[in-house]
Amino acid sequence: TIDLVARLLNLKGSNRPGFIIVGSTPWTISLAMMMKELKAPVMVVDASWQRLALARQNGLPFYHGEILNEATEHNLDLTPYAVLVAATENEAYNALVCNEFAYEIGRDTVFQLGDAVDEDDRHSLPSSIRGRALFESGFGVEDVNERLSRGWVFRKTKLSDEFDFEAARERLPDAASSLMRQDPNRGLAMS
């Protein structure tokens, strides 16, 4: 049918939402590798060629350039990407990236590492310009990199009617954190 022809001609993208990951760190590379394993479109973006070395070594799609540069709009097709994760070491930069792409990708699908905003903290960035917290626990860049160095890994679990999300959570170690789930009916949901 027309759907099959469109796929064969590369006119139609994947059914899975793609991830654009800003910032090339060991943790973001692990996330990108898991997304690639799940056959979701993924792109790692960083302005540093050196930081992109791990992405290149792992055969991950990458973009070498400044995501906020106007030229990037012309050089990087964002069509396959429904989720943006800003995970550089600079929280203010991550917020700026999320704010910039919230209108194009959607405010509900731009995420950054770090805590949800405490509106009473005069040192924190306002929630109106930040991305959503990627983890419910508020893990920041240092937190995820430290956990990764201690053996933290991404795992995937196939859910079913007999083995649902709650049952899967019960089997995880106490220190485990759920990041996302893919539901065939409801799509991608960040946990």
Give each language-model segment a name.
Residues T1-S191:
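Cytosolic regulatory regions of ion transport systems
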